[in-house]
Amino acid sequence: MKEKVIDFGNEKVSILFKKLFFPTLLGMLSMSAVTTIDGIFVGHGVGSDGIAAVNICVPLLMSLMGAGLMMGAGCSVIASIYLSKGKTVLARATITQAMLFVTLISVTVGGFILAFPEETARMLGSSEHLLPLVVDYLVWFSPSLLFELWIAVALFAMRLDGAPKLAMWCSIIAAAVNVVLDWLFIFPLGWGVMGAAFATSLSCLAGAAVAMGYLLFYARDTRLHSLRPGRKKILFFFHDIGMQCKIGSSALLGELTMAILLFIGNQVFMRHLGDDGVGAFGVSCYYLPFVFMIGNAIAQSAQPIISYNFGTGSTERVRSALRVSVFAALVCGVISTAAFILFPELLVGLFLRIDNTAARIAIEGFPYYGTGFIFFILNLSIIGYYQSMEQVKPAITFAVLRGLVFLVPCFMALPAIMGVKGIWLALPLSEILTTLVIVVTFWIYSRQRAIICR
């Protein structure tokens, strides 16, 4: 299971990025495919009500995935710097602590959902009509939370250990298992949204088994090991977890941005267009994680290169990694935007019959919605750059701008001004405004450096 050692300190940055990016991208897209496959089968097996029900659950699930990405990004940055200084034991301890922490989070939240499913569904904004479907999905999906968070952290550690291809296969295996089980549970067995949720839980278990097997028995530098109890060890644990949360918080905010988008979007669409509007928005939101994962794959591929060379003081290699990641973000953003503008019928048709009311609403909105994807992916790559260098303040600032400061007002104001079209344009405008702030920040910083160097 071992792969060739990756030399983060000497190999050409563009070649390093390619080695990491393509396996990471395929793996991340496979992770998104797990939920999207649910949507395709639910859309054709249950209908737009099923998609709306799953979409109501997604903000909570994204928030928890954000916690996993936060811990994965945070522990990976710290472990990268430890490894650049030859401190392998501390790197392993950091990753083990992250795994333990996400285990506690997932068990706590999963237990709450199982104890109070209807209350959780209503808290997420479910209508009485959709409540039985939402409860079914929540109850049967909650066991997967543990495995999803394990995978989220493990993939960071595996890429850092020089095993990006195996990390990719963990996600692909989970997606493949999900396809088979979704078909079996929804169509032959007729289990509906419950079947989709149960299929996701089992598929995540399969992916987590591969990832944890690697970290327990095969990893070179990021292998899990036992943590000794004791007062000082416990204090060190909480201190280290705090640092990981601080460094990775922008990754959490990235997922929370999507969770906020879904939560507020569900409410706004429900108010303007009812359950059909939520179903239409739900189709678009099945694609949003793919766009997010593209940006995330760029940031995660650049992260070990940036963090390692930042730890060794190789400034030019850090800048080179930034240039490569920005170029990749622009290319991927243009392709994503073009797909939504040119092929809305094809994209919507994967989930719903084109003559469906929800489908018609989605087809009209997709071209507006897709205009923001260039800026969406670019913003994620820049936030990842700052996060990789432990520059928490700008990373969090940009993440908060796109997730709260700009997005929420856009959702409130644009529908009042432009009607339904304004709901679709809320995300693009929020991302464009964030990009403008980032560009101005870079310009000011460049001028300050030029003045200092004179």
Where does each model-flagged region fall?
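Short alpha-helical transmembrane segments in multi-pass integral membrane proteins
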Residues: 1-24, 79-146, 190-249, 306-372, ...
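Alpha-helical transmembrane segments of multi-pass membrane transport proteins
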Residues: 15, 30-31, 68-69, 109, ...
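Transmembrane helical elements of multi-pass membrane transporters/channels
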Residues: 19-38, 140, 174, 203-207, ...
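Helix-terminus/linker motif at the lipid-water interface of multi-pass membrane proteins
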Residues: 33-51, 121-128, 184-191, 252, ...
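Interfacial helix-capping/hinge residues at the ends of transmembrane alpha-helices
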Residues: 39, 76-77, 118, 155, ...
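Small-residue-rich hydrophobic transmembrane alpha-helices
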Residues: 51-111, 148-167, 280-342, 376-395
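Short runs within selected transmembrane alpha-helices of multi-pass transporters and secretion channels
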Residues: 72, 141-159, 167-178, 196-212, ...
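Structural signal for membrane-spanning alpha-helices in multi-pass inner-membrane proteins
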Residues: 113, 156, 182, 186, ...
